Design a protein with these regions (language model features):
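Hydrophobic alpha-helical segments, chiefly the membrane-spanning helices
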Residues: 119-123
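Conserved small/polar residues in nucleotide/adenosyl-binding loops
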Residues: 106-111
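Structural motif
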Residues: 36-41, 100-104
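Short loop/turn segments immediately following the C-termini of beta-strands
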Residues: 30, 95-97
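Surface-exposed loop and turn segments in beta-propeller and other repeat-based domains
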Residues: 58-71
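Structural signature of eukaryotic scaffold interfaces centered on beta-propeller domains
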Residues: 2-20, 72-88
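Beta-propeller blade signature
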Residues: 43-46
């Protein structure tokens, strides 16, 4: 795609609109307030309309503890790094607002099957 740069983001909203559509979506699933005593998890959803598993949860990654209340996840590299070849979106940072745990999730080499890389404890 002409005009797009080499890093993990985009220089402008119009450049992002011209980019290829996402094929996977990561979303937080929490049990806070439900009475269910299970760990929160990150769900990977297939959003590629050409895929056989389109619109399905293709992977669930449970957190190690109960009651984290996962919130406001983000990438290790933001869109302002669009001109930096050395940057890539390899990790998702997912904090627990009730536990103060920060989960570092590895999205490469298999973005469908997230791995826990590091789970620093609040203790």
């Amino acid at each position: 795609m002409e005009g797009l740069c080499c890093g993990p983001g985009y220089a402008s909203p119009s450049e992002a609109i011209r980019a290829p559509n996402e094929k996977l979506l990561y979303t937080i699933a929490i049990y806070t307030g439900t009475g269910i005593q299970k760990p929160d998890y990150l769900a990977t959803i297939d959003v590629d309309p050409k895929s056989e598993s389109y619109s399905k949860v293709v992977h669930r990654l449970e957190m190690p503890g109960i009651g984290d209340e996962l919130h406001h996840m983000g990438w290790n590299a933001c869109s302002s790094c669009h001109d930096d070849k050395s940057m890539s979106r390899r990790y998702l940072l997912v904090p627990g607002v009730r536990s103060n745990n920060i989960c570092l999730l590895y999205t490469s080499p298999s973005p469908r099957d997230l791995l826990k890389s590091r789970m620093p404890s609040s203790a």
